[in-house]
Amino acid sequence: MKLIPGILIIALFLCGCGPSEDDVRTIVANELANASARSEVTNAEVIGPYSPAVRIGNLLFVSGQIGLDPATGQLAGPEIEAQTQQALRNLGSVLSGTGFDSSHVVQCTVYLKDMNDFQRMNLIYGGYFQEGHYPARTTVEVSNLPRNAIIEIAAIAFKST
């Protein structure tokens, strides 16, 4: 049997068409154990005691990004479209500061305060990634978000060396 790169197996699992959860846990544990270094990204502002992203080997775990405009310290606007665009710009800023870009994103988690905003968020979100190369995604409705934001987007990216 050919050795399949760990990230491919993880992606297949996230899509529901791959190995079992135990297999994925083993692969992730091996990836983390074999990672040469763990580094915290500090090139972006945060609003709490956490890193904007943590890199372990070829994986980059990006903390949730809200629609906070770094120039003003305020939310980009009250509408889902404006906050989604800004959250994605913030995600892009963290990615580019680490040598990654949107093409490296393999999974996103989107938190919405109101699932009725899903379609409008989806129009903006879909334009951020190259068509046909969308990451796996989970979208959940939550009761509240930091700074009373209406969307937060977290991501995992992979970049081969």
Predicted segments with their positions:
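Sec-dependent signal peptide recognition
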Residues: 2-9
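C-terminal motif of bacterial Sec signal peptides marking the signal peptidase cleavage site
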Residues: 14-16
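N-terminal presequence-like segments and the immediate start of the first folded domain
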Residues: 18-89, 93-106, 112-161
